[in-house]
């Protein structure tokens, strides 16, 4: 009953946001580097924040420093969706938020170099998640797979967080997918959505890694990770400015050049990541070897795909 109520409230909150976005003209206009062709409401992913907030309010204010951190990144990302903000301003908010999350993790009790590594990894993951949000369904669908995996791990492998937190966030992702995981999306996640859900997943995976002392759990993000890193390397080889928008991710080639429906491409990413997670859980004793093998296999697939189809790319 609790989750049904949460679903209904989040659904109503999303509908209310649509009215606000429509009235305030918070929209995404297509351009030559977009993978969509129609004007669409932007920022629907703000519902992820409300999902986390709902858990915070109903759990006796659990994880207050994390919620404050999520509020910071949600705020600056939402502002960026409305009007472009300066890079230094975004970095200030993001680094402040990560410091709060690290404090919630208890990371400051470890050696300083762990904090440096965590800062680099977290910054990379947040940016990668943001870059990968380019077609209908991919952010919501991929996040749903990871959250489902985390829920299973939390129940069957090791308890690293209160289960209600994961399930409440899942409710928010389901609401978003209802409006986005379709041929003609009602809304896009926006930076507020892609950065927000990335931050939530980082918090959960970080707790899992710290609780187990096993970094190989990062395999939960392997599909996004390989696509993002190899695309950056590819663009550097092409002497491009990696800070500028582009359409060179593997999923973008599939959707734009090969004309594969967005929902189909998103489903492929979901299925591949789900298979990887199932395999990892089955062979958990060989975690790091499995992670290395997964990265190598995904990299080979990426390279072969690009060798065959990148010639079709126009921008």
Residue spans for each PLM region:
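Hydrophobic membrane-spanning alpha-helices of multi-pass integral membrane proteins
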Residues: 169, 261-278
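Membrane-interface capping segments at transmembrane-helix boundaries
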Residues: 19-24, 183, 236, 303-315
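Aromatic-anchored segments of alpha-helical transmembrane domains
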Residues: 75, 175, 274-279, 299-302
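Membrane-interface starts of transmembrane alpha-helices
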Residues: 86-89, 190, 222, 260-268, ...
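Alpha-helical transmembrane segments and their immediate juxtamembrane interface regions
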Residues: 76, 87-97, 290-315
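Cytosolic, membrane-interface loops and tails of multi-pass inner-membrane proteins
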Residues: 15-41, 232-263
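"…together with the soluble PPM/PP2C metallo-phosphatase catalytic core" -> "…together
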Residues: 1-229
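Extracellular/periplasmic helix-loop-helix junctions in multi-pass membrane proteins
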Residues: 278-295
């Amino acid at each position: 009953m609790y989750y049904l109520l949460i679903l209904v409230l989040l659904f109503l909150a999303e509908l209310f946001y649509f009215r606000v976005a429509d009235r305030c003209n918070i929209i995404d206009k297509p351009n030559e580097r977009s993978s969509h062709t129609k004007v669409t409401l932007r920022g629907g992913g703000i519902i992820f924040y409300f999902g986390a907030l709902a858990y915070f309010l109903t759990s006796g204010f659990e994880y207050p420093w994390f919620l404050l951190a999520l509020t910071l990144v949600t705020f600056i990302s939402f502002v960026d969706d409305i009007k472009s903000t300066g890079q230094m301003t975004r970095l200030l908010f993001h680094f402040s938020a990560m410091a709060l999350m690290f404090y919630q993790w208890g990371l400051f009790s470890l050696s300083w170099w762990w904090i440096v590594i965590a800062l680099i990894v977290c910054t990379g993951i947040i940016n990668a998640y943001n870059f990968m949000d380019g077609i209908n369904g991919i952010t919501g669908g991929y996040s749903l797979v990871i959250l489902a995996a985390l829920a299973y791990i939390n129940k069957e492998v090791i308890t690293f967080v209160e289960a209600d937190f994961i399930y409440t966030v899942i409710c928010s992702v389901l609401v978003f997918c209802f409006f986005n995981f379709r041929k003609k999306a009602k809304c896009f996640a926006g930076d507020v959505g892609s950065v927000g859900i990335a931050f939530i997943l980082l918090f959960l995976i970080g707790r899992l890694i710290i609780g187990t002392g096993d970094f190989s759990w990062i395999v939960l993000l392997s599909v996004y990770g390989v696509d993002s890193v190899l695309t950056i390397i590819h663009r550097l080889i092409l002497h491009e400015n990696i800070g500028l928008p582009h359409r060179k991710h593997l999923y973008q080639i599939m959707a734009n050049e090969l004309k594969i429906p967005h929902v189909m491409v998103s489903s492929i990413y979901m299925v591949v990541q789900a298979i990887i997670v199932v395999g990892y859980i089955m062979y958990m004793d060989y975690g790091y070897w499995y992670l290395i093998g997964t990265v190598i296999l995904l990299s080979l697939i990426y390279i072969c795909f690009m060798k065959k189809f990148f010639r079709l790319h126009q921008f």
